[in-house]
């Protein structure tokens, strides 16, 4: 079984995802208890914001092995980056293979070095200035949608991202996708959920991959992970 958790208060204009911690933590506690009691063997895909914190909270509430509790942010963030690159180059989105790691928020880490269009690195297709602009827009894409909607937050792309992950689990597709996973030393981070490349199959996260990151990329990823780790301690008491 796969349970996709979307329950929670949506962002309003001017809010960060982290502004939702208190309200949505209570909802995740209730939903997690129900999953634990009625679907004890399920793989859980969390969509609720703030994503990485609520995924960690869900794992603690259910007591499930961490490989069976996953956050969907990386697939969503990568899809947004692919869309912006396709707009810039006038190419098909299907030809864009992006990679976005880190938390689902302002600290996310787009990786241009690992992003290609038709197998060609985007560093060879556009200027550094445009790459940086697209990376920044990727990080703020959710807020852009919230502002335009005025009430509520994004739903089409998150729904599509969750469906991609669920299909990989249900059919044991073993797709390599970026998702919020529980780290136990990978990338120098421990006891935190953060977006990293992983293999998704019938057991949930089958494997986490450690990319060869530059010093700056690794520092950005660790900064993102430590931000959420501090939030877990200071706000949720973990």
Regions picked out by a protein language model, each given a short descriptive name:
Residues 62-68, 77-238:
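C-terminal substrate-binding/catalytic lobe of Rossmann-fold NAD(P)-dependent dehydrogenases
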Residues 16-83:
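Rossmann-like NAD(P)(H) cofactor-binding subdomain of soluble oxidoreductases
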Residues 1-4:
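N-terminal Rossmann-like NAD(P) cofactor-binding module of classical short-chain dehydrogenase/reductase
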Residues 14-18, 210-211:
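Short acidic, glycine/proline-rich loop/turn micro-motifs
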Residues 7-9:
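Conserved NAD(P)H cofactor-binding loop of Rossmann-fold oxidoreductase domains
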């Amino acid at each position: 079984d796969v349970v996709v958790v979307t329950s929670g208060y949506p962002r309003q204009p001017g809010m960060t995802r982290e502004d939702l911690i208190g309200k949505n933590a209570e909802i995740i506690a209730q939903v997690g208890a129900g999953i634990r009691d009625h679907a004890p063997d399920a793989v859980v895909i969390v969509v609720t914001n703030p994503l990485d914190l609520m995924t960690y909270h869900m794992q603690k509430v259910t007591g499930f092995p961490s490989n069976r509790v996953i956050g969907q942010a990386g697939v969503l963030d990568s899809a947004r980056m692919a869309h912006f690159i396709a707009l810039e180059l006038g190419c098909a989105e299907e030809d864009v293979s992006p990679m976005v790691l880190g938390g689902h928020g302002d600290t996310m880490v787009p990786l241009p070095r690992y992003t290609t269009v038709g197998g060609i690195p985007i560093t060879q297709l556009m200027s550094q200035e445009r790459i940086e602009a697209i990376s920044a827009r990727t990080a703020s894409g959710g807020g852009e949608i919230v502002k335009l909607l005025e009430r509520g937050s994004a739903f089409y792309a998150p729904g599509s991202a969750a469906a991609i992950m669920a299909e990989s689990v249900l059919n044991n597709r073993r797709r390599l996708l970026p998702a919020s996973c529980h780290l136990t030393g990978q990338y120098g981070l421990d006891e935190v959920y953060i977006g990293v490349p992983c293999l998704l199959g019938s057991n949930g996260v089958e494997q986490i991959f450690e990319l060869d990151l530059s010093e700056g990329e690794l520092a950005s990823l660790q900064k993102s992970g430590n931000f959420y780790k501090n939030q877990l301690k200071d706000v949720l008491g973990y």
